[in-house]
């Protein structure tokens, strides 16, 4: 092992945060210095040249002042026996740079801790707990101890459970020691079947059976027979869900049988490269819509970042593994936790009810979990466009009397939608003799028993088993696998995939048997052919671990050569681990021990283990009505706006890329002030169409504490009111995912679950014409622990999360909550689907006063709800609505406030028509919406509402103005008069506190201050050219198409939209992978232009873009090609985002680029996804010809975009050279250092540069993602199909003549 010192690991504010944590623990720590340490496991010693190359590779990141280390050394590394995602990617880079002697690289952080007095062992343990995550990391006292990272253990043998002589008792003991979570009747089933086989089961067979038959995988409760209050029920829960499909099968192509459901989409031109020529073009075909929503609650409670990250990753794999290959497109993520209790910002309704030591508190879940979910989506290259966040934790009187209800076991929901070809929707038959393949990363000893562990209430499994069930994420590997799947489905009828499943709970022990069973085959497998990075694992560990980023496939022998070539090009590892057999039998051979760990008929594993029967009793709630004593209106408003469920969610949104693909038509951020209040997410189906897809969410979980059925109905209803202002048409076009979370077995909850499923499956959905073709359940939503001898528990309410998916006719027609002050005289109309009942039970108002109340909102009339949807569809289609916002958490007060925030305007509302009870009128959470309409169209709108049965519940409640006043009257009496800006700031406090805790607090403070500025004009546009003129048209008309190399490296994810932009400008865009260049399959001298695209090459390890650049610099053949291209005078090049970082590291090869800076970690130390205003500078860049002085917004999505110069002279030289091409400006048009207008903190607001001759341009923002007007989060009226940034690409075409 060779040890190589790295750069300092912590910025000043990160050090200060650690010191603050030490002070809070009364530790005498006076200083902390940290630097990265690299450990290289070598097959042979490196010569001087190789060592120098390795040292250069390991020099990366921002320049931070180095210190000579002093103090106590604590070395934090990944846990020995695990391989970090950093290690896999850094090792890839080293090997792609020709360092073949590097077997593996790993990284640790050496902390040097100084203290005013010597630390005791107890104090050292506290410091260790502050600097490392015990779930994923270890701490050593010296550098050499890191050798443990590379120690290779001998393979461990399997063990047998002796039931032949030990009987049932032997299996009962194994059930506990292995954490199998087998039910009593399953133990009987296994004893009986292995006795019949005449042999003892191996541990691996038992674990495999436990995973395949866990509640998590088999959904036993949803398939059970039920007796409620002594009466046998006619249907299982699942049958009631399936009833929605039986009643409304319209538009559903696949339901209940695959990894995701599929519904009919639109016929569009799907844009992708031709499999033979690799030239991008449009393929006119059906782009059907696939949809899936998963939960990952247990892992997120244990270790939030990897828990949420692998939750998103697993759901993405479900979409890719649908049919015989799908394409994930847009994501969502949601969280429900107990109260945050932010230090120094504790709220009056937040009581500390305690928690067990093995799970993380709600605050840490929300500081870490969302980052994990966002990071996976970002790195994979999927925009995250939707979500929700709710907190609930209270002692209430519910069905089981007085008890603490809350979410110590959180809900972490990950979902999304994608597209799939018509001919790929159904899986094929697996041919006998087919190769059975594992595609993706290697097996590692992680995530063991995750399926069974998540099926238990938190606290029932031993802590080290919880520890074992945590997973690791490597999204860049998953991206490579998805690229393989993409290449396969793009072959159309020649797709080599016959069958595909993702690897999830239970690992390949679940996935491979499921694969062959669903394909009506058996399988013969070789254990030692499974790719394995930890040779010391036992057969059980190799077979059952839940290493992520893996898929299992069946490929016919004659298609293996094509499949192999695709995998090699994409650098996606795979292995043939078995062969499909005619006989339905499962065999697993172990060549190392020369034995057969598994040898069983498929029907024992996946046959009919005993069906569950559940008996339940209905319990009634006796909760007192809400008391109003001491509730003062102004204080109530402030409390509700601070409740995390209602409060601004920016801290959850700007961490997630919302523009990748260039197909996003509606993200969370609305209008010129980019306020996060969108009702739903909308994507375009392709670049040549306005057809698209929409998704929205609905959940009202606290209501279940009063009325199970009402909670379920409201979830469905809210998903509809959220999506109603998009252009969908027939309500039957909407399909729902239902995710059910329940503390099964808790008094009253089983009967309540049955009531809720019946309410939507048998009643509401059939009445509305809605189908639920997909969903998931998590039946162990309870946390138990012992605190000082006292048994404690926190039980979640029954929680139904509904996600609605729909095909959209015209994405341009989507209406947002932004109130419009530029449309003349307008009115606000409330449609109240509660019909004046104004029920306050389980509302935000009740919660912030520590109450529950008695009667909650409900859907009393399905026909009226459908009438509401139909009315909104008619008004959307006729362009009659200026703004639309549904009424939900916080009631009408919050709906109006959020609309005012988005419109930056005043509101004058009168609620006299809503009854005398002001609190009930303002804070009830009955379904409904507020719309803004022009006064000259008001009668027409009201008549449309009346025609749909809504006349009695539609009320004109006010108007808007350009002021800062938020005024609510009842008749002539003013009941609330506030400054909109003040309310906006209160609404923002929660997000500010969370950002300040998690990110650079100086940046968080600047963003918070900016929200106090009422004079902010918002985003605006000033162009030096006509956006609707196509200056490339004359050149395109000539028919010549210059060749454009669309360059990508493993992990790059923005290449398709880049190709689409150049294609539109008249180029022949060709897909080129770096592996094509390194293997000589592609030669750059055939091309006129080259673009290095954005994404996460090598997952940004070794510096963003640096690993990619070094794989060029350290490879003689690649270096020569790039240098020759840059020196050819009739070429041009562009680098965007990751490509910008990469080209800046190649500046030694690029003429006139010698002054270019480096791009390093953002000042906020956070991935920043913003829609930022920039100004094009006067420069010689061929891309910006005629654009100087233009000011327009652009997509920003990066974690390492801050310009780093050597010193002030370097910066002055850059400015003097005239090579600055783009700068960030504030909304007044001035270059700015203020965050978030300058999202990365670059000096002089520089974010784009060019060479002295203008042929090579680099920029951090993404013009290719907003080349269409519809892809801009906000655009001024008057722009046609092309957005302003299309001019860049047209300039490139004009430049070549």
UniProtKB/Swiss-Prot annotation:
Pathway: Purine metabolism; IMP biosynthesis via de novo pathway; 5-amino-1-(5-phospho-D-ribosyl)imidazole from N(2)-formyl-N(1)-(5-phospho-D-ribosyl)glycinamide: step 1/2. It holds the Pfam family FGAR-AT_N. Keywords: ATP-binding, Cytoplasm, Glutamine amidotransferase, Ligase, Magnesium, Metal-binding, Nucleotide-binding, Purine biosynthesis. Mg(2+) binds at residues 718, 722, 886. It is found in: Cytoplasm. Residues 1044-1297 form the Glutamine amidotransferase type-1 domain. One of its GO terms (cellular component) is cytoplasm. Transmembrane segments: none annotated. GO terms for biological process: 'de novo' IMP biosynthetic process. One of its GO terms (molecular function) is metal ion binding. It catalyses: N(2)-formyl-N(1)-(5-phospho-beta-D-ribosyl)glycinamide + L-glutamine + ATP + H2O = 2-formamido-N(1)-(5-O-phospho-beta-D-ribosyl)acetamidine + L-glutamate + ADP + phosphate + H(+). ATP binds at residues 307-318, 678. The active site is at 1137 (nucleophile), 1262, 1264. PROSITE patterns: GATASE_TYPE_1. Disulfide bonds: none annotated. Its EC number is 6.3.5.3. It is an enzyme of class 6 (ligase). The keyword Calcium does not apply. The keyword Ligase applies. In the N-terminal section; belongs to the FGAMS family. Phosphoribosylformylglycinamidine synthase involved in the purines biosynthetic pathway. Catalyzes the ATP-dependent conversion of formylglycinamide ribonucleotide (FGAR) and glutamine to yield formylglycinamidine ribonucleotide (FGAM) and glutamate. Monomer. HAMAP family: PurL_1 (MF_00419). This is Phosphoribosylformylglycinamidine synthase. It comes from Vibrio vulnificus (strain CMCP6). The gene is purL.
């Amino acid at each position: 092992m060779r040890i190589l010192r790295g750069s300092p690991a912590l910025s000043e504010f990160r050090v200060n945060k650690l010191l603050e944590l030490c002070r809070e623990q009364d530790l005498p720590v006076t200083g902390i210095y940290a630097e990265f340490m690299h450990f290289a496991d070598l097959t042979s010693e490196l010569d001087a040249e190789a060592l120098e190359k390795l040292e250069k590779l390991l020099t990366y990141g921002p320049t931070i002042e180095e210190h000579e280390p002093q103090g106590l050394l604590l070395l934090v590394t990944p846990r020995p026996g695990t391989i970090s995602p950093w290690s896999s990617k850094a090792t890839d880079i080293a090997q792609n740079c020709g360092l073949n002697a590097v077997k593996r690289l790993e990284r640790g952080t050496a902390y040097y801790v100084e203290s005013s007095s010597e630390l005791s062992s107890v104090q050292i343990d506290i410091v260790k707990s502050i600097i490392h995550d015990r779930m994923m990391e270890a701490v050593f006292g010296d550098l050499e101890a890191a050798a443990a990272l590379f120690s290779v253990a001998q393979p461990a043998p399997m063990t047998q459970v002796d039931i032949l002589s030990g009987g049932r008792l032997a299996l009962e003991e194994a059930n506990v020691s292995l954490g199998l979570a087998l039910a009593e009747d399953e133990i009987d089933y296994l004893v009986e079947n292995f006795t019949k086989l005449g042999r003892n089961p191996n541990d691996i067979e038992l674990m495999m059976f436990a995973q395949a038959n866990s509640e998590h995988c088999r959904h036993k409760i949803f398939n059970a027979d039920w007796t409620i209050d002594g009466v046998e029920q006619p249907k299982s829960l699942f049958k009631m869900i399936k009833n929605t499909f039986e009643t409304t099968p319209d538009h559903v192509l696949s339901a209940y049988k695959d990894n995701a459901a599929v519904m009919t989409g639109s016929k569009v031109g799907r844009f992708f490269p031709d499999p033979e020529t690799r030239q991008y073009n449009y393929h006119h075909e059906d782009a059907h819509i696939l949809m899936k929503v998963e939960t990952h609650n247990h892992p997120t409670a244990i270790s939030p970042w990897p828990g949420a990250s692998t939750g998103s990753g697993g759901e993405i794999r479900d979409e890719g593994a649908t049919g015989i290959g799908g394409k994930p497109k847009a994501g969502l993520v949601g969280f429900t936790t107990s109260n945050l209790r932010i230090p120094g910002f504790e709220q009056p309704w937040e009581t500390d009810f305690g928690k067990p030591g093995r799970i993380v508190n709600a605050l840490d879940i929300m500081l870490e979990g969302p980052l994990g979910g966002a990071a996976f989506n970002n790195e994979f290259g999927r925009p995250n466009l939707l979500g929700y966040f709710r907190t609930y934790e209270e002692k209430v009187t519910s069905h089981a009397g007085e008890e603490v209800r809350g979410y110590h076991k959180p809900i972490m929901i990950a979902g999304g939608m994608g597209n799939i070809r018509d001919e790929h929707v159904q899986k094929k038959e697996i041919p006998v003799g087919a190769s059975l393949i594992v595609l993706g990363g290697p097996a590692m000893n992680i995530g063991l028993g995750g399926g069974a562990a998540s099926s238990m209430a938190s606290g029932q499994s031993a802590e080290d088993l919880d520890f074992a069930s945590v997973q690791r994420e490597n999204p860049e590997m998953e991206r490579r696998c998805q690229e393989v799947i993409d290449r396969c489905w793009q072959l159309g009828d020649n797709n080599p995939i016959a069958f595909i499943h993702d690897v999830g709970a239970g690992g390949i022990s679940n996935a491979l048997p499921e694969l062959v069973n669903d394909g009506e085959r058996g399988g013969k497998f070789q254990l030692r052919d499974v790719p394995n990075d930890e040779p010391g694992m036992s057969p059980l560990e190799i077979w059952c671990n839940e290493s992520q980023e893996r898929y299992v496939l069946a490929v016919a022998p004659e298609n293996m050569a094509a499949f192999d070539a695709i995998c090699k090009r994409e650098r996606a590892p795979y292995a043939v681990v078995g062969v499909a057999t005619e006989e339905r039998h499962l065999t697993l051979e172990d060549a190392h021990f020369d034995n057969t760990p598994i040898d069983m008929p498929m029907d024992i594993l996946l046959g009919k283990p005993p069906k569950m029967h559940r008996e339940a009793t209905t319990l009634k709630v006796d909760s007192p009505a809400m008391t109003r004593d001491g509730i003062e209106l102004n204080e109530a408003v402030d409390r509700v706006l601070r409740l995390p469920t209602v409060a601004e969610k920016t801290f959850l949104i700007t961490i997630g890329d919302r523009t990748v693909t260039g197909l996003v038509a509606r993200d969370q951020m609305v209008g010129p002030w980019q306020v996060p209040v969108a009702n739903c997410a909308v994507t375009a189906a392709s670049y040549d169409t306005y057809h698209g897809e929409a998704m929205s969410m609905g959940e009202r979980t606290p209501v279940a504490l009063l009325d199970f059925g009402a909670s379920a109905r409201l979830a469905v209803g809210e998903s509809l009111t959220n999506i109603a202002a998009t252009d969908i048409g027939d309500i039957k076009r909407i399909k729902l995912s239902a995710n059910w979370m329940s503390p099964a077995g808790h008094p009253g909850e089983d009967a309540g679950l049955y009531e809720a499923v019946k309410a939507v499956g048998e009643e509401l959905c059939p009445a509305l014409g809605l189908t639920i073709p997909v969903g998931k359940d998590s039946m162990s939503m309870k946390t138990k622990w012992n605190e000082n001898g006292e048994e404690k528990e926190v039980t979640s309410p029954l929680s139904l999360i509904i996600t609605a998916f729909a095909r959209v006719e015209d994405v341009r027609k989507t209406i947002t909550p932004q109130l419009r002050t530029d449309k003349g005289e307008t009115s606000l109309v409330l449609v109240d689907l509660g019909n004046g009942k104004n029920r306050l039970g389980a509302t935000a108002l009740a919660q912030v006063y520590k109450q529950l109340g008695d009667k909650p909102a409900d859907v009393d009339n399905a026909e009226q709800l459908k009438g509401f949807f139909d009315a909104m569809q008619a008004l959307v289609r006729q362009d009659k609505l200026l703004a639309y916002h549904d009424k939900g958490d916080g009631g009408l007060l919050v709906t109006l406030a959020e609309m005012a925030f988005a419109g930056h305007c005043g509101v004058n509302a009168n609620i006299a028509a809503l009854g005398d009870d002001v609190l009930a009128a303002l804070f009830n959470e009955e379904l409904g919406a507020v719309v803004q309409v022009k006064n000259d169209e008001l009668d027409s709108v009201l008549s449309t509402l009346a025609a749909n049965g809504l006349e009695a519940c539609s009320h004109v409640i006010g108007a808007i103005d350009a002021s800062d006043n938020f005024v609510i009257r009842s008749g002539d009496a003013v009941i609330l008069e506030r400054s909109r800006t003040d309310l906006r700031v209160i609404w923002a406090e929660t997000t500010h506190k969370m950002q300040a805790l998690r990110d650079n607090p100086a940046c968080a403070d600047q963003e918070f201050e900016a929200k106090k500025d009422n004079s902010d004009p918002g985003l605006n546009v000033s162009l030096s050219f006509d956006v609707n003129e196509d200056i490339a048209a004359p050149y395109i008309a000539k028919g010549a198409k210059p060749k454009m190399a669309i360059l990508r490296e493993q992990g790059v994810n923005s290449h398709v939209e880049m190709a689409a932009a150049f294609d539109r400008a008249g180029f022949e865009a060709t897909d080129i992978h770096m592996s094509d260049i390194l293997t000589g399959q592609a030669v750059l001298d055939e091309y006129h232009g080259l673009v290095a695209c954005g994404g996460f090459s090598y997952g940004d390890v070794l510096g963003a873009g640096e690993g990619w650049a070094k794989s060029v610099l350290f490879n003689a053949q690649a270096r020569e090609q790039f240098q020759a291209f840059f020196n050819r005078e009739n070429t041009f090049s562009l680098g965007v985002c990751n490509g910008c970082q990469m080209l800046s590291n190649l500046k030694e090869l690029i003429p006139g680029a010698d002054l270019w800076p480096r791009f390093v970690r953002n000042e906020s130390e956070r991935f920043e996804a913003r829609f930022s205003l920039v100004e094009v500078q006067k420069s010689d860049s061929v891309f910006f010809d005629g654009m100087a002085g233009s000011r327009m917004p652009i997509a920003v999505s990066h974690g390492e975009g801050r310009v780093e110069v050597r010193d002030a002279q370097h910066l002055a030289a850059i400015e003097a050279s005239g090579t600055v091409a783009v700068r960030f400006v504030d909304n007044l048009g001035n270059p700015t250092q203020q965050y978030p207008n300058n999202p990365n903190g670059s000096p002089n607001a520089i974010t784009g540069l060019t060479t002295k001759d203008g042929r090579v341009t680099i920029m951090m923002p993404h013009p290719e993602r907003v080349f269409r007007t519809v892809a801009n989060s906000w655009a001024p009226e008057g722009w046609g199909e092309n957005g302003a940034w299309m001019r860049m690409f047209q300039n490139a075409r004009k430049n070549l003549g």
